[in-house]
Amino acid sequence: MTDYSLESNFVKQLDSDILDFIKQRLDNHNDKRFNELALSEFELQYHTIKPYKEYCVKKGAALSKIDTWEQIPAVPSLAFKKFILTTFPIEKAEHAYFTSGTTDPSRKGSIYRDKGAVDLINAANGLLTRKYVFPDVDRMKILLMTPSPKMAPGIGIAIGLERVRTEFGTPESAYLITPLGLNVELFLKSLIESERLGEPIALIGSTTGFIYFLK
């Protein structure tokens, strides 16, 4: 019987294999290997997340019937509001935060990630950010239209953008959302200074933050 615990060889090897795949960068088009990894991840989730397994069985998508990653059932967003969906005990979570509650503010979904998942997400996000946001510069001043993780430890975008700030930002990079709201003074001062010096800055954040400022 296969051991799917967090410390098992199966999980450690799967994390290592996915990380190796990510490190092959965006020009890697090994569809066969991608499918193998996706099926292994599905196997892990199928055997360790009871609500997900029940959902798959009801949809006629038992593990034995899945051959390609396209056949793997996607989890409805409502499931994160009703269940704790993790492949590991939540006390071993490295990150824990809530979804935005867009569909129902009174019932926010909860997401937990172990250290292996955090490492994989950081590697993938770093690769995409370098490719599509900072392809021609190592670091840049970044103004973040979000609260910091210290101010909002349960918000996923705050956690993710802190990684962007530390990996791609200069020391002058800053968060614009404070306990008092949007720091308009810092925002405008930074824009004027950037124009005067001819130095670009990156404005990154949620759409809502920009809407509030433009209004």
Predicted regions and their residues:
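Short secondary-structure capping/turn segments at boundaries of alpha-helices and beta-strands
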Residues: 40-42, 84-85
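Short secondary-structure junction/hinge motifs that connect adjacent elements
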Residues: 33-39, 53-78
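Active-site phosphate/ATP/adenylate-binding loop shared across adenylate-forming ligases
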Residues: 3-26, 59, 69-215
